[in-house]
Amino acid sequence: MAPPNGTTNGETEVATQGSYTAVSTGRKTTMHRLIEEHGSVLMPGVQDALSAAVVEKTGFHAAFVSGYSVSAAMLGLPDFGLLTTTEVVEATRRITAAAPNLCVVVDGDTGGGGPLNVQRFIRELISAGAKGVFLEDQVWPKKCGHMRGKAVVPAEEHALKIAAAREAIGDSDFFLVARTDARAPHGLEEGIRRANLYKEAGADATFVEAPANVDELKEVSAKTKGLRIANMIEGGKTPLHTPEEFKEMGFHLIAHSLTAVYATARALVNIMKILKEKGTTRDDLDQMATFSEFNELISLESWYEMESKFKNFTPKAT
């Protein structure tokens, strides 16, 4: 039976109820292999090295370096186009070092400029240990995909960026996601048209941001080619679904972009209120990690073991 969404350059796709099998003629990335193995991949967002370590130790296979979350954690600022590509690369390098077994995919916003800027950015992300990137078609300065006031560049302009990114990636183990924010300003059909154009330009997967309901999600799945991404934001425009539900709808990668930063913010606000009101936390220790739990999280004992190797130096006898 012919695949419902056709074939792509370099691979044959077979899609049934969200499953995906790629027969590669050259490149197959870590993310491709995860999707083949699991059908759909749940990818929590991370904002820093600590959150990445938590995600890895919890047993996830992939993580998403969320620009929204990094902007908040690093700068204390909203996702309003204020984060630079240099800061994104810096955050990514720390995250991949803290969680070396995760397949780390990065929110690349608009790529830092034109096609040549995109190519430099891609090479720096690869050097920083990333395994993939999202590149979106918003006008710069961009905004969070679930905020008001978004605008998009001409589709052909973003397609050139995707083509440039594909060239920069070459044979690297790096997964390219083309994101479109056209749903809000121009409607779902335009978002779908752009997604397919960007797939043709060289994207491994496409991401139509902020479908408003299940019917729109199903329409995206039915009308877009190749691998598809869904983004779950608590309180956002798209209703929350499980990976199994998304697999049935025909989505392959599910990002929970802001779960970690929202949970961190709530916990921090709550404990700071207690400390301000009571002047102590002695009756509320259950709201925090213990000293030993936290030390285990950051692998303290492994550092003691490494330290012990270098306590004494004995020169060779001559």
From Swiss-Prot:
Co-factor requirement: Mg(2+); Mn(2+); Fe(2+); Co(2+)
Cofactor binding, note field: Binds 1 Mg(2+) ion per subunit. Can bind other divalent cations such as Mn(2+), Fe(2+) and Co(2+).
Annotated spans, Disordered: 1-24
Reaction catalysed by this enzyme: oxaloacetate + H2O = oxalate + acetate + H(+)
Prodomain positions: 1-3
Tissue/organ expression: Accumulates in senescing flower petals.
Keywords: Hydrolase, Lyase, Magnesium, Metal-binding, Transferase
Induction trigger: By ethylene.
Binding site for Mg(2+): D107, D109, K142
Pfam families xref list: PEP_mutase
GO biological process: oxaloacetate metabolic process
Domain of life: Eukaryota
pH-dependence of activity, as noted: Optimum pH is 7.0.
EC nos: 3.7.1.1, 4.1.3.-
GO MF entries: citramalate lyase activity; magnesium ion binding; oxaloacetase activity; protein homodimerization activity; transferase activity
Subunit text: Homodimer and homotetramer formed by a dimer of homodimer.
Function in brief: Catalyzes cleavage of the C(2)-C(3) bond in oxaloacetate and in (2R)-alkyl malate derivatives to form oxalate and acetate, and alkyl carboxylates and R-ketocarboxylates, respectively.
Family: Belongs to the isocitrate lyase/PEP mutase superfamily.
The name this protein goes by in its record: Petal death protein
Protein's organism: Dianthus caryophyllus
